């Protein structure tokens, strides 16, 4: 559910905030945590200051999340988090919608 995410990264406090429904036993939630850890590393390494927009950070996080899922579980990010490619294009775009 995009209106009630399982986890978010708070770059100001360097904290990953997880929803009460977060379940580390599921592949879905493990992959979401991985995604948020990527954001933590992006901010820790000042990658956020070298990108055109936040969409570039999301693109890298989803790409790495997909690679991790493929390697560890032989599944794609698309199938695991039920995200379609149109939504991916929108959230990784540097255009304003």
Region annotations inferred by a language model:
Residues 1-27, 40:
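Active-site scaffold of zinc-dependent metalloenzymes
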Residues 21-25, 29, 49-53, 57:
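Conserved aromatic-histidine-acidic binding/catalytic patches
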Residues 28-37:
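Short alpha-helical catalytic segment bearing the HExxH-like zincin motif
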Residues 37-54:
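Catalytic Zn2+-binding segment of zinc metalloproteases
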Residues 52-86:
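Post-HExxH zinc-binding segment in Zn-dependent metallohydrolases
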């Amino acid at each position: 559910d995009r209106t009630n995410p399982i986890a978010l990264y708070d770059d100001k406090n360097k904290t990953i905030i997880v929803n009460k429904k977060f379940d580390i036993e599921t592949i879905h939630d493990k992959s979401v945590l991985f995604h948020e850890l990527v954001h933590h590393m992006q901010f820790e390494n000042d990658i956020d200051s070298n990108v055109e927009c936040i969409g570039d950070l999301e693109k890298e996080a989803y790409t790495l999340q997909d690679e991790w899922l493929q390697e560890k579980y032989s599944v794609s990010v698309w199938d695991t988090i039920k995200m379609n490619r149109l939504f991916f294009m929108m959230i990784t775009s540097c255009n304003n919608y």
